[in-house]
Regions:
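Conserved glycine-rich cofactor-binding loop
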Residues: 19-20
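Residue(s) in the substrate-gating loop at a strand-loop-helix junction
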Residues: 144
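Short C-terminal tail/terminal secondary-structure segment
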Residues: 2-3, 227, 238-254
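Alpha-helical segment proximal to the catalytic Tyr-Lys
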Residues: 129, 173-174
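Active-site helix of classical SDR
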Residues: 124, 160
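A conserved structural motif in NAD(P)-dependent oxidoreductases
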Residues: 211-222
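Short, small/polar-rich loop/turn modules that mediate ligand/substrate recognition or access, typified
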Residues: 176, 181, 237-239
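Catalytic Tyr-X3-Lys loop
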Residues: 95, 102-122, 140, 164
Length: 254
C-alpha cells in the first residue's frame, strides 16, 4: 500500500474501462480516497462485483465501440443527478491484437483504433461539457510506450496510442478556457489481464518480454500517476504525456 494518499472527498470522477486492470485499480483507489466514482465498462458481471466493493462506486454498462452520443449523455446525466458535476475522468478502455503490415484482420484493426482513440474522444466530447463538468476538471487518457518505440506486430495498437498522445495536446487547447486539464500516460508492460492474454495469444511467455529497469509494472505502479494528475497538485500540468514504465525506455537500444 502506498504511503502517499490523496483526499478526493466530495469529488466525482468517471472511469471508463473500469471492470479490470488499470481501470479497476484506478476506480478502486478513487473510491478509497473518498470520491464518488462512475465505473463504466462492458461487463455487467464485473461491474456488479465492483459495486459491492464500495458504496461510493456507481456503475453503468456501456460498449465504447457502439455507444452513441446519446448513450454517453444518458450515463453522465444520471451520475450528475445523483452526485453533482464531475471533477474529472479517466479513459482506460483499450484492446490489442496482432496487426502486422504484411497481413492483418481489418475488423480487429478497426476495433483497436476505435476503442483506444474514437472512444476516448467521444467520452471527452460529452464529459467536458459545461453541464457535466466543474470548472478545472482533469482528464487522463492512456497512450503506451508502443507509441514511442514501434513494436513489431502492433501496427494499429501503436498507431492508436500515438493518436491519443497527439490528441491530448490539441484537446488541451480546446478545453483550457474552462480551466480543464488533460494529460496522457504511457505505461510499458503492466501485469494485467489484457497484457497476459495478449502474450498468451502470440505464444510469448512472461519471461520472454523485456521489462524495465525496475521490472514488470503492476496496476498500482501506474494508478499513482493518475491520481496525481487528477488532483489539485497538478493544476498547472496539461497537454503532456507521462511515460510510466519502470525504466523500460532507457533500455530500448540495449
Amino acid at each position: 500500500m502506498s504511503d502517499v494518499h490523496f483526499d478526493f472527498s466530495g469529488e466525482n470522477f468517471v472511469v471508463v474501462g473500469a471492470s479490470s486492470g488499470l481501470g479497476r485499480q484506478i476506480a478502486g483507489e478513487l473510491a478509497e480516497s473518498g470520491a464518488h466514482v462512475m465505473a463504466i465498462a462492458r461487463s455487467t458481471e464485473r461491474l456488479d462485483e465492483m459495486k459491492r466493493t464500495s458504496p461510493l462506486i456507481q456503475t453503468a454498462a456501456l460498449d465504447v465501440l457502439t455507444a452513441s452520443a446519446e448513450d454517453w449523455t444518458a450515463v453522465l446525466e444520471q451520475f450528475v443527478r445523483d452526485h453533482g458535476k464531475i471533477h474529472g475522468g479517466v479513459y482506460t478502455a483499450g484492446i490489442t491484437g496482432v496487426t502486422p503490415l504484411k497481413g492483418y484482420d481489418r475488423n480487429m484493426a478497426t476495433a483497436i483504433f476505435q476503442t483506444s482513440f474514437d472512444g476516448s474522444v467521444d467520452f471527452l466530447q460529452c464529459a467536458s461539457k459545461k453541464k457535466f463538468s466543474e470548472m478545472g476538471a482533469s482528464f487522463v487518457l492512456f497512450s503506451s510506450v508502443a507509441s514511442y518505440e514501434g513494436t513489431k506486430g502492433l501496427l494499429f495498437y501503436a498507431s492508436a496510442k500515438s493518436a491519443v498522445r497527439t490528441a491530448v495536446r490539441t484537446i488541451a487547447k480546446e478545453i483550457g478556457h474552462r480551466g480543464h486539464r488533460i494529460n496522457s500516460i504511457s505505461p510499458a508492460w503492466v501485469d494485467t489481464e489484457m497484457t497476459n492474454s495478449y502474450l498468451e495469444s502470440v505464444g510469448m511467455g512472461q519471461e520472454s518480454v523485456r521489462d524495465g529497469i525496475l521490472g514488470r509494472g503492476r496496476p498500482e505502479d501506474v494508478s499513482g500517476m493518475v491520481l496525481l494528475l487528477l488532483s489539485s497538485r497538478a493544476r498547472w500540468i496539461t497537454g503532456q504525456d507521462f511515460v510510466t514504465d519502470g525504466g523500460y525506455m532507457c533500455g530500448m537500444w540495449d
